[in-house]
């Protein structure tokens, strides 16, 4: 017997080539079955999702959950919209990543990956992102190597120049 049966939803599952009304049985955190007309008595709970789309978790590849006034807690901005995995794009830098991880990543149900801002302060405001002396390639590379389970790249943005110092520092960090 499954824990939950999603009954009558329109399943869209590109990996398995499904784009039609189907039922979805869930046991624990696993999909137990996807089929037409799964009997309701095979589930502890039944949710009528007729008129709704049912799809594997979506991925948000550009989100802000740290370092800006628009930043939101991952679960608040993701889960209500079917997003189960997100990429924070540079809210934290090498100096404040550990705080970001403790405050936002660890408590979240949403799976969070991040780009580490080349600026140690992260997206702490426009002036902070102009601080070339806070763009430390070595510290950025060390933090990425320390947390490769979460950190998947380097963010550089909002730099007014002159020149390409922010990009040069990010490339230096990436090459380490």
Question: Where would I find each of the regions flagged by the language model?
Answer:
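Fold-independent oxyanion-binding glycine-rich loops
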Residues: 8-9, 14-15, 34-35, 49-50, ...
């Amino acid at each position: 017997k499954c824990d939950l049966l999603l009954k009558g939803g329109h399943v869209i599952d590109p990996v398995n080539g499904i784009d039609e009304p189907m039922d979805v049985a869930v046991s624990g955190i696993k999909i137990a079955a996807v089929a037409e007309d799964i009997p309701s008595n095979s589930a502890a709970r039944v949710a009528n999702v007729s008129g709704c789309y049912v799809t594997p978790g979506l991925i948000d590849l550009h989100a802000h959950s740290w370092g800006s006034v628009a930043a939101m807690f991952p679960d608040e901005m993701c889960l209500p919209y079917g997003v189960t995995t997100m990429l924070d794009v540079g809210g934290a830098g090498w100096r404040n990543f550990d705080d970001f991880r403790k405050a936002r990543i660890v408590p979240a149900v949403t799976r969070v990956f991040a780009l580490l801002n080349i600026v140690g302060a992260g997206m702490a405001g426009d002036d902070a992102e102009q601080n070339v002396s806070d763009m430390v390639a070595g510290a950025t590379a060390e933090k990425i190597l320390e947390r490769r389970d979460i950190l998947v790249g380097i963010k550089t943005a909002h730099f007014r120049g002159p020149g390409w110092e922010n990009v040069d520092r990010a490339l230096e960090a990436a090459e380490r």
